[in-house]
């Protein structure tokens, strides 16, 4: 007897504008319920305090979420100088207060020091896991556990505003960068302490900012569909981006129809014009149907690694 599905089969990526005050997993579950999707996964957690772009993959798109986890991010952040908190943001308790004696040039010089590659020790108040539990669970119990420094890259950090004890910046960084840690380190560098009061993710990979939708907008569309006696799918599905947008940074290899079946059965194939190495995005035929991602093997062939399964 076939297993009964717990949701509908729907594939794509929705760019959720996560509200403040809820976890990324809570936001994911709300979107999954609204779409009635069988499978869903997000592509990199945001702090409950943070808002902004949270790409959520539905269906077969979940197979490619790691590529978005590994992609560059952009954040807009407001920091308050003069107060250091135990979480490095305004959700925590103030643990130190110091006077602010910072001028514009000193601030610019300190900010510039964060550009480039560096080692960053993740905050105890992060979603990274230690022995199967998020670090923040240990932190809330007053337990500190060992964390290894991780290589991060800050490609750009720009000062947008400096008024009184408030600093507003935009940061373009690699995966795994903790903006709260940057702000805390900046505060110590300035000698006055600092913590995050607003954090908004404004970019993931090359996804367009204007395609984000809020939970309120999604709920309103569902309610309107019910009033109009329309299928929810008819109003929500057009908001989805194609699943291959998760891997559009990879070079494309287009295979002829005769090779599509071989690829879909997991066989490596020779494709003229393919790169000499690395990961590739595989499409098939003149319509460039997205088949999945592959890797150039030692024989120069395109070897499929993660494939899309279409249909029921």
Curated annotation (Swiss-Prot):
Pfam families: TruB-C_2, TruB_C_2, TruB_N. It catalyses: uridine(55) in tRNA = pseudouridine(55) in tRNA. Its EC number is 5.4.99.25. GO terms for molecular function: pseudouridine synthase activity; RNA binding; tRNA pseudouridine(55) synthase activity. Transmembrane segments: none annotated. CDD domains: PseudoU_synth_EcTruB (cd02573), PUA_TruB_bacterial (cd21152). SUPFAM superfamilies: Pseudouridine synthase, PUA domain-like. Keywords: Isomerase, tRNA processing. Responsible for synthesis of pseudouridine from uracil-55 in the psi GC loop of transfer RNAs. This is tRNA pseudouridine synthase B. The lineage of its organism: Bacteria, Pseudomonadati, Pseudomonadota, Gammaproteobacteria, Vibrionales.
């Amino acid at each position: 007897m076939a297993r009964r599905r717990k949701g509908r089969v729907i594939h794509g990526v929705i760019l959720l504008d996560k509200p403040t005050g809820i976890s990324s997993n809570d936001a994911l579950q709300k979107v999954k319920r609204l779409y009635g999707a069988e499978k869903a996964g997000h592509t990199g957690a945001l702090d409950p305090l943070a808002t902004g772009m949270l790409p959520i993959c539905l269906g077969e798109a979940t197979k490619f979420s790691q590529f978005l986890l590994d992609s560059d991010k952009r954040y807009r952040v407001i920091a308050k100088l003069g107060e250091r908190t135990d979480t490095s943001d305004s959700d925590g308790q103030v643990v130190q207060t110091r006077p602010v004696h910072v001028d514009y040039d000193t601030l610019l010089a300190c900010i510039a020091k964060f550009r480039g590659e560096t080692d960053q020790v993740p905050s105890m108040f992060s979603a990274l896991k230690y022995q199967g539990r998020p670090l923040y669970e240990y932190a809330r119990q007053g337990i500190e556990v060992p964390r290894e420094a991780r290589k991060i890259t800050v490609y750009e950090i720009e000062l947008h505003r400096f008024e009184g004890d408030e600093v507003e910046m935009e940061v373009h960084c690699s995966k795994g960068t903790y903006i709260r840690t940057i702000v805390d380190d900046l505060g110590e560098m300035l000698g006055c302490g600092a913590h995050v009061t607003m954090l908004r993710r404004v970019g993931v990979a090359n996804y367009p900012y204007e395609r984000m939708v809020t939970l309120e907008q999604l709920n309103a569309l569902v309610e309107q569909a019910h009033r109009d006696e329309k299928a929810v799918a008819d109003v929500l599905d057009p908001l989805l981006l194609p699943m291959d947008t998760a891997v559009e940074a990879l070079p494309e290899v287009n295979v002829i129809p005769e090779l599509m079946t071989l690829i879909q059965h997991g066989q490596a194939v020779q494709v003229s014009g393919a790169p000499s190495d690395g990961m590739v995005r595989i499409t098939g035929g003149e319509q460039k149907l997205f088949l999945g991602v592959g890797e150039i093997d030692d024989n120069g062939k395109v070897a499929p690694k993660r494939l899309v399964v279409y249909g029921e």
